[in-house]
Amino acid sequence: MTIFMRLTPLPAFLIAMTWLAPGFAQVPEAPQTAGAPAASEQTPPDVLQLQGRTLRTYEVPEANQGVAAGLTHFFAVDNATLAKYEIKSGRLVDRWSGAPNGPIRHMNSCMVDTGRIRCANSNYPQTPMGSSIEEFDPVSLEHVSSYSFGMRDEGSLTWFDRYRTGWITAFSHYDKNGGVPFKDHSFSSVVTFDQQWRRTGGWLLPESALERMAPYASSGGAIGPDGWLYLLGHDRPELYVVGRPTMGPVLVHIATIAIEAEGQAFSWAKNGQRVIYTIDRRKHLVRTIEIPPVVVKDASVRRFR
């Protein structure tokens, strides 16, 4: 005997629920944004291991925090002291010194820029952290102007450089002396500003570089002639090279360069060569070091210039 059953059509909402049930969901593939890397290209590139070459060494008693290079002179930085040396002869030309424990008490770094020596100053190791930019005349070493950040949640200003039409900077936190108990060195970051020092963006430091800087953070930094950002920690003889991510808030670590220097502020030569001026703070030396090319072909990382 054959049995016939009458099938009643399912209501439309039940059909919709069937398609949306687990195992039946039909999710269209997200369109690829023009210029964005494919998923396979979003994995960070391998970190290159490179070696710098020392070219020249200067004996500089003031080489304690860093050095800034001009065309004919370099300027050694030591907290509240700025010393001017002739590049060709290594001769001391002049020295500026602030009052002990005065308003300029901890210059972390300086840069020679548009007829000025611009220096990152902080109240380290005092807390709350306060920072300012102090400017000097490169000829007379006379102090000419000051810009105060006051207290910022980002931490203590350690270095800054030109970036697009504004600035790129580092604000640091510390695990020990000079830090605060609720923020360790991992809260350090790179921050961008416009010409009037209004914040425009920023990034976290990559863990692979940050762990090498602990318990401090980035004490020196500058964009190189190749457009990558180069960073020095507090004491390791290593230069960390990072790029901008195409997505996300963390810088991309692309290379580590072994150099004969132990951290802190450095400066690129003004002649456009791949040479940096850096210091050995324990021996009170300034060294010029040739930096090898950093070649990275990866769609997930971009240069700063």
Regions found by a protein language model. Name each.
Residues P37-P61:
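A short helix->beta-strand "capping" segment at the edge of beta-propeller domains
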Residues A120-G130, A170-F187, T288-I291:
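Short, conserved, GDST-rich strand-edge loop motifs in beta-rich repeat architectures
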Residues G130-S140, D184-W197, V241-R244, I291-V294:
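Beta-propeller blade signature
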Residues A69-L71, V112-T114, R162-T165, I223-D226, ...:
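Residue-level detector of Asp-centered blade-edge/turn motifs that repeat once per structural unit
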Residues T54-A80, H106-N108:
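Beta-strand-rich domains and repeat architectures in extracellular enzymes and scaffolds
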Residues L55-P61, S97-G102, Y147-D153, W203-A214, ...:
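Surface loop/turn motifs at the tips and blade-to-blade linkers of beta-strand repeat domains
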Residues R91-P128:
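Blade-loop segments of beta-propeller domains
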Residues P249-K270:
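Conserved blade-ending motifs and adjacent loop-strand segments that build the rim/top face
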